[in-house]
Amino acid sequence: MKRTKSIHHASFRKSWSARHLTPVALAVTAVFMLAGCEKSDETVSLYQNADDCSAANPGKSAECTTAYNNALKEAERTAPKYATREDCVAEFGEGQCQQAPAQAGMAPENQAQAQQSSGSFWMPLMAGYMMGRLMGGGAGFAQQPLFSSKNPASPAYGKYTDAAGKNYGAAQPGRTMTVPKTAMAPKPATTTTVTRGGFGESVAKQSAMQRSAAGTSTRSMGG
């Protein structure tokens, strides 16, 4: 009986300790989660070209040129592609489209379809690029091409957007902003052509999701 009593007392002590330590454990977990969130964000700079970057970063001209050229290559690989020039212009505006290199991520059957309709496929010009530190703390820089529409009817009008349609605010180079580290991750190559207005729809959906997420965050902070 004494032994049984001892076991019950031990169980009681463990139960009491668990109940009283749980809030502390939760608090510690919350701190680590917050720390993780802080580390998941990154400050990036937005530039129109290598000259803008060099002017803002004296002594970093070589790095700026490398980042700009890498962004151009990434734009060729990931930008929305259109079967005709007219489809691209309808989305991004006159003077904002160019013929895309035939090897820029398109599957052979899609290349054939595009070339049959217009001799090539089309993509928007890179309007600017984001530049930030490499993920993992490397010494180099990461970059992400940005696109912008000059067609007032497009959801991307006057805004910087990435290849996935995510909106990064006004198409105004020379500013800095905080973005999730995932924003700088390479985007998948474009392997199919986009229908007219399709990219604008992606931008509209992404913007709605961003507003919804921001509203949820504000309500959570406000209790």
From Swiss-Prot:
The lineage of its organism: Bacteria, Pseudomonadati, Pseudomonadota, Gammaproteobacteria, Enterobacterales. HAMAP family: UPF0441 (MF_01188). This is UPF0441 protein YgiB. It holds the Pfam family DUF1190. Residues 204-223 have a biased composition (Polar residues). InterPro entries: Biofilm_formation_YgiB (IPR009576). It comes from Salmonella arizonae (strain ATCC BAA-731 / CDC346-86 / RSK2980). Residues 201-223 are annotated as: Disordered. Belongs to the UPF0441 family.
